Amino acid sequence: MALKQVSSSKCFGGLQKVFEHDSVELKCKMKFAVYLPPKAETGKCPVLYWLSGLTCTEQNFISKSGYHQAASEHGLVVIAPDTSPRGCNIKGEEDSWDFGTGAGFYVDATEDLWKTNYRMYSYVTKELPQLVNDNFPVDPQRMSVFGHSMGGHGALICALKNPGKYKSVSAFAPLCNPVLCRWGKKAFTGYLGTDQSKWEAYDATYLVKSYPGPQLDILIDQGKEDEFLSDGQLLPDNFIAACTEKKIPVVFRLQEGYDHSYYFIATFIADHIRHHAKYLNA
């Protein structure tokens, strides 16, 4: 599958690149970002996938989070895909910021209008990793995932639905229990229909209750001043309770004074990369 390089910039001794390709799963052109650390010049590196939140493209993380120095030092290839298919001309796709374009929610849609293109779960867990493994110096056996908000939800479900595939998982302000929040209800109804039992297959709080192992150490940072926390969109307490019940280790850090923004992510990104490097470089 042909990759077209869109951009390449040197950063902390490595290269921040963006590529475009024709996606089989999403049936449209997709862009994704890839950071190749200096170590990638001489051998295969572990790979860390970042999943972004609502309204984002592949650009937000690479331009705002300041992750490059830590990724360079730890020798990690970092992949950041877009958050939805683009330009599919589906009725209603552009109507709201929390559904359709920029809001794929990392599910495989089953509703007629969306099921042909909106297959972000299969894209980020199957098609994109295959593409990355085939085209870049990565070790497919050493892979981890993290994300923010809707992408934090994505990271958690990808890890929980694929035991052993990802060495570690972390999230910033994730939607932990989307079947119970407004964003989740809207997205799941649109993409998956009204049968709520189908929704549970993409809800971290439900998935963790039936997670069979191997052990997964989960790191979550949450800003205490996050408007979406107080608004009931994120519901981390429900997820932590489910983890505790299942004896799955989760480090949850409520960060005083921080909000939902990339300033919050930039503050703690090095901690998260260190968390993943511990497992990826073991």
From Swiss-Prot:
GO CC annotations, alphabetized: cytoplasmic vesicle; cytosol
Q: Which keywords are on file for this protein?
A: Acetylation, Cytoplasm, Cytoplasmic vesicle, Hydrolase, Serine esterase
Reaction catalyzed:
S-formylglutathione + H2O = formate + glutathione + H(+)
TM stretches of this protein = none
The Gene Ontology biological process annotation of the record reads: formaldehyde catabolic process
N6-succinyllysine occurs at: K4
**Residue positions of the active site:** S149 (charge relay system), D226 (charge relay system), H260 (charge relay system)
EC number assigned by the record: 3.1.2.12
Q: Which GO terms describe its molecular function?
A: carboxylic ester hydrolase activity; S-formylglutathione hydrolase activity
Instruction: Spell out the InterPro entries in the cross-references.
Output: AB_hydrolase_fold, Esterase-like, S-formylglutathione_hydrol
Keyword flag ATP-binding = no
Task: Please verify whether the record's keywords include Acetylation.
Answer: yes
Tell me which residues bear N-acetylalanine: A2
Enzyme kind, highest EC tier: hydrolase
State the family it belongs to. Belongs to the esterase D family.
Protein name per Swiss-Prot or TrEMBL? S-formylglutathione hydrolase
Q: Provide the species name.
A: Bos taurus
Its encoding gene is what? ESD
